[in-house]
Amino acid sequence: MAELTLVPEVGNTFSFMEEMGTGVYDELMKYYTDKRVLIVNKDIDNSVIESYAIRILRWNDEDKNIPSDKRQPITILIHSCGGDLFSTLFLIDIIKQSKTPVHTVGMGLVASAAYYIYINGHDRLAFENTVFLQHDGTISIADSNSKVKDFMAFNDLMEDRIKESILTQTKIDSDFYDKTFDKEYYFFADKGKELGVVDKIIGQDIELADIF
């Protein structure tokens, strides 16, 4: 089976919080979950279902009798090299269908698949020195010749969907996308704001205390 992974070649997980004592870690997670804050600080994988999607669905259920503009927003803090594209597309579907506002906050590195999640936030914030990466990812396939051909044909459809999402969610046009798609295109938050990737830069357009 083919594995479609979108991470830069230097990809690492950022699970440093797990090195804390269990009690401290659990206390921090509960504190932020109670504030409807989700933390993406590792590679994107199948755990998005129980870690993020289920919570977004639950909060939408809790809010079903509240007008969308009166609901407590959900905030997703993102510091990730990216990861599995199938899991990424599923989480994007959940975010897009959420009637409860979902705010994404870029911090550190927002790369590849994590970048696609970020741009689908209803309101997109970033710290000044947040680094974004848009690229074509990495494909790992170990299968028969015919199955590889089948997957590559399907991969073209995936690329079309990714392109359409970027063109829809940002100010990036088709020409600029085509010129940068097969490159490792890194940029900071100020360039992201110019490209329509970032809505607000923390410390310039919004204060940190106003996010939560």
Predicted features along the sequence, with ranges:
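Terminal-region recognition feature
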Residues: M1-F212
